[in-house]
Every structure is written in C-alpha cells, then in structure tokens.
C-alpha cells in the first residue's frame, strides 16, 4: 500500500537522539526498571522487558548498566518508584499530541507538560481527547532502497498487519503489539534490519503543516521531548 513517508521525521528524531544520548539512556533505564518490577527479570516471560533491552542495545548502553538496572529493580534494594502517566493535547493547527511520561512526582510533571504546551501556543486536553486518533501497534521502518517485495513477503508471512510504501521509498511495516517481536525477528533473520523498530502510537490520519506553523510545531515537540520525565511523544502532524 502507498502512504506518506515518515523518513524526514525519523531522521530528525535520530539526530536529536544522537545529540542527547545521556537523556535517552535515562529514559531507557526508567523503562527497564518499570518493566522488570512489573514482570520480573526473566526475559522469556517478560516481553516488555525484552523490548526495553532492545532499545538499550540500539542506544549502545553498556551491558553492565543494563544488568545493574534489572538487578536493582528485581532485588530487595530500595529504588525510585515511577508512575506512568499519559497526557494529551492540541498543537499548532489543532494537531493531536500524546506525551507519555514516567515520573516520581506527578505534580511536577503535569506542571512542566502544561507549561511546554502553553509556552508554544498549544493546549493540554483532557484524558481521551486525542488518543482515539492513534493506533497502538508495532512499527518497523526500512530505508529507501530496501526491497519492497522481500520486506512484504517476509513480514506478511510472519504475521504483519500491513506493509506501506512511503512516497520517497521508505517502507513501513505495521503489526499488532503482540506480534511485533515475531515479525521483527523474522525480518532480521532474512537480513532486513530496520532504521526504526518500536511499539508505538501511530496516527490514523495526519495534518500537514508548512512554513511557520511547521517550525512552531517542531519547537513544541522538541520542548516536550526535552522534559526530564518524558518517555515518548506522538503526534499526527506532517512537517
């Protein structure tokens, strides 16, 4: 199927991650802690922890740091307790935004998220105000030039829901969250390594922003991403 390309947004996001690796590691360590406490340290029985470790390895986090966080989360040692909170809001041009956070102080976090929205001419919404515009799914994105036929054949045989060709040649594979690992592993076994692989909130429809509106939206997204308690930011804007 044809679809809008996410390539420019992915490249921008990867560039920011490279610039702020320390912050990315902090977010991943929080995810490891929450996943290990909720489901234990046995990787075979804890898919959320497996996904967190995949993120850690992709971010080049040292193995000893990963092990330390799992041991700390599953042992008797006292550590920080994190609460997962989702915020929703409206960006430039009415674009829908979801901000997923992990925090040890919800009052601090909601104040920081609200301030970021208002500072950039946007508004926080109520729970459920925009989340219906997104689909919880697995997503793998392959660079332009990848073989669409090969990706499609392997992905669909492994249980993918859809394979979408972007306007610039990038290929997007979508899965149910429960099927994400199996599809990713099948594609990797076939020698197909994605530029992006994650369980995400994918916008069902997009809003195109241009010029000054696009620049303002990007500043808002960057501000939300830069908050210490932010784990992920999802939106439906094409910039």
UniProtKB/Swiss-Prot annotation:
Q: Which UniProt keywords apply?
A: Cytoplasm, DNA-binding, Transcription, Transcription regulation
Top-rank taxon of the source lineage equals: Bacteria
Organism of origin:
Verminephrobacter eiseniae (strain EF01-2)
Keyword Transcription regulation in the entry? The reply is yes
So what family is this one in?
Belongs to the TACO1 family.
Segment Disordered: which positions? 1-22
Q: Does the keyword Transmembrane apply?
A: no
GO biological process assignments: regulation of DNA-templated transcription
This protein's major location comes to cytoplasm
Where does this one sit in the cell?
Answer: Cytoplasm
Protein name per its UniProtKB record? Probable transcriptional regulatory protein Veis_4238
InterPro entries of this UniProt entry?
Integrase-like_N, TACO1_YebC-like_2nd/3rd_dom, TACO1_YebC_N, Transcrip_reg_TACO1-like, Transcrip_reg_TACO1-like_dom3, YebC-like
A single GO molecular-function term is:
DNA binding
